[in-house]
Amino acid sequence: MIPVASRASTIEYAIRDVVVPATKLEAEGHQIIKLNIGDPIAYPGLPTPPHMVQAYIEGLAQGNNGYSPSYGLPELRDAISKDEASKGWDCTNDDVYVCHGVTEALQIIFAATLEEGTKVLAPGPHYPPYMAYPQMYGASTIEYALKSDDGWAIDLDDIES
């Protein structure tokens, strides 16, 4: 068996860590709704919208099913940069890097910005990778509270403490 790297053995990943106890509870007869992975197909009430199915079919028929450029399709990067610019951001196509999802985006951002010993502030409640991924790069995460009764505003007193 290949040994696990020491840095990997300390990483907690709450999205998947809940699967074992949830499966045990299901075996005991409890009804569990699994929202931890974000798989919309797992829920019959959330079918893929017809226009998306049609776009997929058309893309396959046109042969648009291979690898895209590393930074993303130029048309998509253009649409994203225009949308961000319309919100007041100084954004051009060169500022846009299209990722396969938030997981990849977070890993790229953390790899590019974190050094050993860096401390990262993350809001709570949070998306579990905010806590787990910095550990991969030798950083640590400090969770701070959000005020649910105040539109999820940052609790500055909690950060200061």
How would you label these PLM feature ranges?
Residues A111-S161:
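PLP-dependent aminotransferase-like
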Residues D39, P74, T103, Y127, ...:
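Residue-level detector of flexible, active-site-proximal loop/helix-junction positions
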Residues S9-G101, I108:
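N-terminal small-domain helix-loop-helix segment of the aminotransferase-like
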Residues M1-A8:
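Generic N-terminal amphipathic, Lys/Arg-enriched alpha-helix
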